[in-house]
Swiss-Prot record:
Lineage start: Eukaryota, Viridiplantae, Streptophyta, Embryophyta, Tracheophyta
Protein name per UniProt: Protein GRAVITROPIC IN THE LIGHT 1
Gene symbol of the encoding locus: GIL1
Pfam families, A to Z: DUF641, GIL1_IRKI_C
Record InterPro entries: DUF641_pln (IPR006943), GIL1-like (IPR040225), GIL1_IRKI_C (IPR056813)
UniProt organism field: Arabidopsis thaliana
GO biological process, one term: response to red or far red light
Amino acid sequence: MLPGILLCSLNPRNHSKKKKSERESLETEPKDIDYWYSVQFNRDPPRFALKSENNNHHSRSKSGGDFCKKKKRGEMANKVSNFSDLIQRVTASCLLHPLSAGRQDLAVNRREEYDTEEEENEEEGEIQYEDALEKENGKDETIRAKNGRNGVSVETVQEMEMVMDEVFTAAAAMKRAYVALQEAHSPWDPEKMHDADMAMVAELRRIGSLRERFRRMRGTGSGGRRKNDAGRGMLREAVAPYEAVVKELKKEVKVKDTEIENLKEKVKVASMANGNGGKKHRLLSSRKVNCTTQIAVSPVPELFEMTMIQVKEASKSFTGILLSLMRAAHWDIAAAVRSIEAASASSDGMSASSFASSVQSSVPNQHAKFALESYICRKIFQGFDHETFYMDGSLSSLINPDQYRRDCFAQFKDMKAMDPMELLGILPTCHFGKFCSKKYLSIIHQKMEESLFGDSEQRELVVAGNHPRSQFYGEFLGLAKAVWLLHLLAFSLDPSPSHFEANRGAEFHSQYMESVVRFSDGRVPAGQVVGFPVCPGFKLSHQGKGSIIKSRVYLVPRA
């Protein structure tokens, strides 16, 4: 061993040369050295670990580590038997190969340094590879975050934008359709109403389909919860039309119930007023047939009489509804009747003292409807003798009477079959509309309406030039239309009929008067005078023949 050590420590010049030669030899020496005591150095050139090989290196190191250790231990046991044998082999090696021995020691040191560097390089490569993997994972997560935290693709976003554009377009179209619907209300235009309604329904269906499309888009990219929400939404969408139909049916049921109550009231009034008038009804029906056959030819007194009967029926119906509203509002009906009688007496020119002496209990409670009907008829027939009910100063009937009569009869034929509510919806400010507004405001004053309905909403609409679509106002329009048609017929006839009204306290004349109260034997007892007039009468003259429509009066015993 000592000669080998001495031979290895030569002069510096030779030592530097040896280092260079050793560096060259290291590049050509084999890679794997089994143990440091080996004599020959037969190895492959050293290799640097690549990043792609690190994974294979780690996997092999785990699986084959134990096997390699066992193999090397067996080889060591075979090669080295004892410590003395080892010393002899090393000494022989130094004597036989003095230069290679020094090179071997240097190579061993170099190899240890190289192994250390290689391990460090491998560790650095592993660290760099792990950093690269982390960076790649971070980039993937960033890309996923940019694409959408919920996994929304670019195509889905574009489709969402298209859906939103369609939603805004549908909303704008629905707004235009709603404006058209409002314009069709005032003035009332059924065709425009139908078109606007169809447009509104179409746009609503379009928005509903867009909503379902949006829900399907959300359901495809989400979990079961959104699918369940979409299912519930589709169920609500399917049930919604049926719920709307049920609501409409409920409204119709309420309307029908109200109509039934009104018809019951009409039947009650008709049965009380016409208890034994079966024969009279047959005569009226025959008159109605005759009038309908002659309506398109020319105005005749029979047509006027038939229209007057319609006025009586309409006034009874409206009076019954108004009286029921008063009772529902807990009015003092007796006080209201006294107030009506006082107003009737003052219009007839009676003094308050003379009226007060006879007004006590003159009208029983069951006859209060006659006093209320008297009040209504007096208000609505006021100004009947003028061609426009004194709403303006027109004198067309005097300037061109023949043309005016033809125009009035043409208006009568046009208006007879029309619904007054629809007519006023189309032409709210026509002459008939102005007549309805004026008469309603004179019959139903503000305090009365507030007491009956709790507010004055209908009155405010009428003052503004509109016409409410309520049941009460509809009943009033029925009476107003009947009086307006009677007025048109009156100015269509030549000569025009003259109307008259019985004064309070006047004696009863069966030729000109008709009692609203039915007596037991069908005849009016002696000593009855007019308590107050209920409805005016008319005197007709046509082609030398005259007829009279009797005035309806409420009779009381002479005081």
